[in-house]
Every structure is written in structure tokens, then in C-alpha cells.
A protein has these predicted regions:
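Extended non-globular scaffold/tether segments
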Residues: 1-326
Length: 326
């Protein structure tokens, strides 16, 4: 403390304890600064922290419990007292864009996913703008692998929201970073097949069913149909090379063919698709199964006039050099 002597009195100045500093901001209805300050205390980045005793773990526990109580108060305040009384769509979007991310970030900093997916979710899902902002906040944490396990009821809303807003690329990326038990597989597969999110389809087959052959067969069927529909044949490819592919197929069909090449290459190299590694005890089986699929004499649902080695023929016709590199 500091004592200042004046002409007619003296003044005592004291540094507030960490708890008093938190309470001061709460009483001033300045919850965002309060959450930021509490986060600094918790991550050991706060300045002039007074009043905390014990081990580092004990301090974190005390601060964490305090900030959770602050968070629950804030959830009530921001959806009632602080809620814009007269606001259009833009005002509401800006309001929730300001208040939702700090709440999500605090829960993850405190490692309290239970609170995030219970009290915080329940508070924000009642308003469509708050709900949308909450779901979009999850994206960065999913992609950074901080959130791999999410309740299925919430991922269902996440998938629905991203499909409605046509954020297909972001949705596909997020699906491949979530553990499969977090997903409603029927819902996700329907969305992925509808919009051609092949990475996510492969990921679910590989990680949810340990099936590395079916996705290849399904994607081969689509590519073969596309090449047949375009009037593409092997002699044209021999005469014109890869350029003949780009002229006759759409960009999405070419992308599919390239994905197939990369997927097969990953499987034969013991690498997971689209990232990571295949479990050691699965590598040999995956290599054998995928190689057998690639060199199959006929496809799974072969027509009577199907030529032999349809999958090899398809990739050789699509991109000879690419297949040889594989």
C-alpha cells in the first residue's frame, strides 16, 4: 500500500487483490474485460496478481472456479439485461459476434467442455443469431484439433448450419478433424454425397468403419461414369495426353480423379487420407486390400461388356503419368 500525506488529510492507496479486480469489473457490467483479465490470471500472464496462494495447480483451480461463476452470470446478463432491445439483423449479428467468442474461448482455456456444451450452448441456442455464431466459433477450434469430441446433437446442428450457408469446404475440413463417434453418420454422408465432399466420405469410411476399399470403389464408379458420359476413350488419351482429360471433364470431375490418385498413393504408402498415418496394425491389410481393388479383374457391379481391369484402365486413361508415380 501507499500512504499519501496531503495538506488536510492523508490517503491510503492499495492494490486490489485479483478477486477484487474481477468483482470490480463484474459490478461495472464490463464482463468482456473481466473474462480477458481472468484468462490472463489463469494462463499466468496477469500483472500484479495479489491474493493468490498455494501451488500453481491450486491457483488455477481457484481462478477457474471463479471465472466459471462469472461466465454463468454473464450468460444470464447478455441474454437479458444487455440484450439489444431494438436492433435489426446487423445489430444482433454484431452483438453476438462480440460476446460469443470470448465465452467459447474461456471454456476451452479452462478445459471445461462440459460447460461449453451444456450451459453455454443452452444459453445461445435459443436465439438464431447467437446459435449461428456459436457454431461458427467452433470451426477454428475443430481445425486446430482442440475440439475432436463434440456431442452429436451439436454436430448435427453444425452440419445443418454449414450446409444451409453453403460453407461446404469448411464443413468438409471440419468433418475430417472430428472423431467419427461425434458425427451423425447418416446425416453427414447424405450431405457429403449431395455436395461431393469426397475427403469427408473417405475419412468416415476409413476411420468409422475401417473400410479402405468401398470409398475407392464408389469414387471409381463416379469417375468411370463421368468419363463414359463425356465420350472419352483410351485412343484419344494416347493421342492427346492429359490435356484431353481437362477438355472433356468438368473441374469437379478432374478433382475427383486427382483425389483418387492421391488416396491410393496414401494407402499404398501407409499414410492416412487426407492427413496423418494409418495405425501400424492396419497398414499391411490396407496396402493389400487397396492394391487388390486397384488391380481387380472386374468392378463390383460389372456390366456384361465391361473390359478387364476397369480401375487400372480408368486411371491410366485419366492420368497415365500420375498412376505410374503412384
Amino acid at each position: 500500500q501507499i500512504i499519501l500525506l496531503g495538506r488536510s488529510s492523508f490517503h491510503v492507496l492499495m492494490i486490489r487483490t485479483w478477486n477484487e479486480r474481477i468483482e470490480y469489473l463484474v459490478k461495472a457490467n464490463n464482463y468482456l474485460d473481466c473474462i480477458a483479465l481472468g484468462t490472463d490470471f489463469y494462463t499466468d500472464q496477469g500483472k500484479a496478481v495479489v491474493g493468490l496462494k498455494g501451488s500453481k495447480e491450486k491457483k488455477k483451480s481457484v481462478i477457474g472456479n471463479k471465472m466459471l461463476s462469472v461466465l454463468l452470470k454473464y450468460l444470464n446478463v447478455c441474454m437479458s439485461k444487455n440484450f439489444p432491445q431494438e436492433g435489426n439483423m446487423t445489430v444482433l449479428k454484431e452483438y453476438f459476434a462480440t460476446i460469443v467468442p470470448p465465452c467459447v474461448n474461456l471454456c476451452l482455456t479452462l478445459k471445461r467442455k462440459d460447460v461449453l456444451f451444456d450451459q453455454v450452448w443452452n444459453a445461445f441456442q435459443v436465439d438464431p443469431f447467437a446459435k449461428a455464431t456459436f457454431l461458427e466459433c467452433l470451426e477454428s477450434f475443430i481445425l486446430s484439433d482442440q475440439l475432436r469430441n463434440v456431442p452429436v446433437s451439436i454436430t448435427q446442428e453444425f452440419v445443418k448450419h454449414y450446409e444451409i450457408t453453403e460453407r461446404y469446404m469448411a464443413l468438409e475440413a471440419c468433418v475430417t478433424h472430428l472423431n467419427v463417434p461425434s458425427l451423425d453418420i447418416h446425416q453427414v454422408m447424405n450431405v457429403c454425397w449431395t455436395h461431393g465432399l469426397y475427403d469427408a466420405i473417405i475419412y468416415i469410411y476409413n476411420n468409422g468403419m475401417l473400410d479402405f476399399v468401398t470409398p475407392a470403389e464408389e469414387l471409381f464408379a463416379i469417375l468411370i461414369q463421368a468419363m463414359d458420359s463425356s465420350g472419352f476413350n483410351e485412343s484419344q488419351h494416347i493421342n492427346n495426353g492429359y490435356e484431353s482429360v481437362t477438355k472433356r471433364l468438368t473441374s469437379s470431375q478432374i478433382k475427383l480423379g486427382n483425389k483418387l490418385l492421391v488416396y491410393i498413393s496414401c494407402c499404398l504408402a501407409g499414410r492416412a487420407y487426407p492427413y496423418g498415418d494409418i495405425a501400424n496394425d492396419q497398414v499391411k491389410r490396407v496396402k493389400t486390400d487397396v492394391y487388390a481393388c486397384l488391380t481387380a479383374l472386374h468392378s463390383k457391379k460389372a456390366a456384361e461388356d465391361e473390359l478387364v481391369y476397369p480401375y487400372l484402365r480408368t486411371l491410366l486413361t485419366f492420368d497415365t503419368q500420375g498412376l505410374l508415380n503412384v
